[in-house]
């Protein structure tokens, strides 16, 4: 049996049936990591001994009948901005190079309760600020589909680890597309749930009103299964929702008859690579052939999404990142003659250029004299974007479009031009601003063999509709 080719759900079934064990699966994936990390660099930290010990404990519980769930024994990777008790959590930043949390994020605990084995922490853009996983203090991650290209970001390490078979599934976080865009670039499935569905407790904050944890997986079945596992109401997160409809795997039905799918004309204009456009529209035709009603419509305000997002996200980041000052934990500059100099040097030396850029922008838009002109205006536009989506979902069940305007860029091409990097999020950020769920599903490759993702967007709390549409497409093209 080729263990590594199995999906997470298939692996758990094989373990339950005694065809393999959690220890064998963990050892196989650790061997793959050892062989591939020099090329791909998906991980910041690999907890080899800890993972094998955890796998042994899980295997005993499976054999005793104490763990029977659909993810028991499955090795997972965790993005390095989620706290993991006793394991280095760096946010891919120098400022947290020595930070070992004393608790785990709620989403990670939910996985562990289900019997998942935690392999380690994946590389990311520093503090999740970036779209290429090139702003990491610990080096760039490469795209397993073509190592000369980026894996996307900021959850690039998680997406690349799934694509390279260096884990069976992974957790990422999505503030403006950070799960969906790398999923598209690496040819895996990635989902951002409705805001408040998965607890943010233990997620190191970037933009608190936008951040959401979600799965990166090999297929839609795994995606629904992981989402069902990590979803829970958590009183430790004030934005956590109490949801009744969290049996997401019940939506794994290949049936879109009568489903109304809207295609925004605004998403298919100038700047979209023709190969991406053709692949996404071909995917829409597949759903149409399965009985969905597909039509074009106008979704205005997309042009305002980028300035609105970068105003709000930078403002929240400048506030959230104030806590990293060299006093209680993290990097501390040496030889400072007074407290103020120590703060200044710790932050100057600890943060990378992209993080500094966003802290400066955020501080500017929140400063007196500019607060109304920029920040409050951005909040008003955010409300208008939500209203535009509400109007669209009064008519359509699902909105279908591209995830990114191009396939994965070459390494180094985006860092030279930050604006180009920001524009790469044009199709994903409005979903975060509106708090909606979105999923990226592989829908082909370009002429270079680089993956293309189709994005399906749903109304708040309509993950099941998205899963049904994504599953139908996936089964239709198998």
Regions from the language model: what does each represent?
Residues 1-53, 289-291, 364:
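An N-terminal boundary/leader segment
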Residues 18, 79, 219:
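Short, conserved phosphate/pyrophosphate- and ester-handling motifs at nucleotide-, phospho-/glycolipid
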Residues 25-29, 308-309, 355-363:
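Short alpha-helical scaffolding segments that buttress acidic/His motifs in well-ordered protein cores
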Residues 29, 51, 79, 111, ...:
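Conserved hydrophobic/aromatic pocket- or pore-lining residues that grip, position, or stack substrates
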Residues 31, 35, 39, 164-271, ...:
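Structural helix-boundary/capping segments
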Residues 71-91, 250, 255-262, 315-386, ...:
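Short helix-loop capping/hinge segments that flank enzyme active sites or metal/cofactor-binding pockets
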Residues 71-213, 264-266, 315, 401-419:
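Short glycine/serine-rich loop/turn segments
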Residues 94, 98, 141, 239-244, ...:
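Short, surface-exposed loop/helix-turn segments at secondary-structure junctions
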């Amino acid at each position: 049996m080729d263990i590594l080719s199995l999906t997470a759900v298939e692996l758990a079934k094989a373990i339950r049936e005694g065809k393999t064990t959690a220890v064998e699966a963990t050892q196989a994936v650790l061997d793959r990591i050892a062989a591939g990390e020099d090329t791909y660099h998906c991980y910041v930290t690999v907890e080899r001994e800890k993972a094998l010990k955890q796998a042994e404990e899980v295997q005993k519980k499976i054999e005793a009948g104490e763990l029977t769930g659909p993810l028991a024994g499955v090795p997972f990777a965790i993005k390095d901005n989620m706290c993991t008790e006793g394991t280095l959590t760096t946010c891919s930043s120098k400022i947290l190079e020595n930070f070992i949390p004393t608790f785990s994020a709620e989403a990670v605990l939910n996985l562990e309760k289900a019997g998942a084995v935690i392999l380690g922490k994946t590389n990311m853009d520093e503090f999740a600020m970036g779209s290429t996983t090139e702003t990491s203090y610990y080096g760039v991650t490469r795209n397993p589909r073509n190592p000369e290209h980026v894996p996307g970001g900021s959850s690039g390490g998680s997406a690349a680890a799934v694509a390279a078979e260096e884990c069976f599934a992974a957790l990422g976080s999505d503030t403006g597309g950070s799960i969906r865009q790398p999923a598209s670039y690496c040819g895996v499935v990635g989902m951002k749930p409705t805001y408040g569905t998965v607890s943010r407790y233990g997620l190191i904050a970037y933009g608190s009103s936008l951040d959401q944890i979600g799965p990166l997986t090999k297929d839609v079945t795994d995606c629904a299964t992981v989402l069902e596992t990590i979803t829970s109401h958590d009183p430790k997160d004030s934005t956590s929702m109490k949801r009744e409809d969290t049996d997401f795997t019940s939506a794994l039905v290949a049936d879109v008859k009568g489903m109304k799918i809207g295609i925004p004309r605004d998403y298919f204009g100038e700047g979209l690579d023709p190969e991406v456009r053709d692949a996404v529209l071909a995917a829409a035709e597949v759903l149409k052939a399965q009985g969905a009603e597909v039509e074009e419509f106008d979704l205005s305000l997309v042009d305002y999404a980028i300035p609105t997002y970068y105003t709000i996200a930078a403002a929240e980041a400048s506030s959230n990142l104030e806590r990293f000052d060299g006093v209680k934990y993290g990097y501390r500059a040496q030889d400072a003659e007074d407290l103020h100099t120590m703060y200044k040097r710790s932050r100057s030396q600890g943060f990378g250029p992209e993080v500094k850029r966003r802290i400066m922008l955020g501080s500017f838009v929140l400063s007196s004299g500019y607060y109304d002109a920029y920040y409050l205006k951005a909040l008003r536009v955010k409300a208008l974007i939500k209203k535009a989506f509400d109007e669209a979902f009064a008519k359509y069940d699902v909105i279908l479009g591209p995830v990114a305007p191009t396939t994965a860029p070459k390494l180094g091409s985006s860092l030279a031009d930050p604006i180009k990097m920001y524009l790469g999020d044009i199709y994903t950020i409005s979903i975060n601003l509106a708090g909606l769920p979105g999923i990226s599903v592989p829908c082909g490759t370009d002429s270079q063999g680089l993956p293309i993702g189709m994005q399906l967007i749903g109304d708040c709390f309509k993950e099941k509709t998205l899963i049904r549409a994504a599953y139908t497409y996936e089964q239709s093209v198998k």
